[in-house]
Amino acid sequence: MGKPSEQRQQEIVTSTIELCAEQGVNKITTQVIADRVGVAQATIFKHFKTRDKVFEAVLRWLSGGMFKAVEPMFKSKASADVRLQNVIRKQLGFASQHKALPRILFSDRLHSDSSVLKGIVQQVMARMTEAFTQLIRDGLESGTFASKQSPEDMAKLVVSTMQGTLMRWSIHDYSFDLQDEGPALYEYYMQALLASNPAAWTDGLIEDK
C-alpha cells in the first residue's frame, strides 16, 4: 500500500532540498529525485505535474519555514536594534540548516525557465524587504536609528547584504560557519543606520524584557 499523498509529497520536497544542497539546481531532474526518494519517476509525476511544480513546492516550503522562524523576531516588542539582531541570527540559523536555500533562491536557470518560480522569489524578497522597512521605521521613530536614508532604501541594503552573504557561503561550498557572519553584519547595519548606543551582539537570542 502506497504512502498518503501528503506524506509522499513532503518526501519529494525534502529529497529535492537535500539534492540541491549537494549538487546544485541544474543537475536535478525528476529521475534524480525519484532515485533519491526510492520510487519510479511516474510517482513523481503523480504528485507534481512537472519539475517546476516540484521546485514551486520546494520554494514555498523553504520560504514558509524562513518566515515562520523570523516573524516573531520582527513582531517582538524589543527595541529595533535588538529585533534586527535577532532576525539576523534566525535567518542565518535557518539557512545553516537548509543549505539548499541560496542555491535555489539565486538560481538564474531556475528563474529564467519559469516565470512562476521567479515570481515566488520576488514575493519572498518583497515580503522580507517590507518587514525590514517597518523595523527600520520603528527604529527611526524611537530614536534608536538616525540614518537620513529612507527606511525603504535601508531595508534594501539589509536584504541585499544578507543575500550576498548567503551567496558567498554557497559559492564557497559552505566552507565557513554562516552563523559566524552575524556579528559583522550586525555591526555593519548599526553603522549604516547610525544607531545610537546599539545593543551588543550576544551569543543567543535576546528575550523581550
What annotation goes with each model-predicted range?
Residues 73, 105, 109-112, 169, ...:
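Secondary-structure edge/capping motif, primarily at the C-terminal ends of alpha-helices
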Residues 64-67, 71, 115-142, 152-156, ...:
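Amphipathic alpha-helical packing segments from all-alpha helical-bundle domains
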Residues 140-187, 196-209:
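Hydrophobic/aromatic-rich alpha-helical bundle segments in the mid-to-C-terminal region
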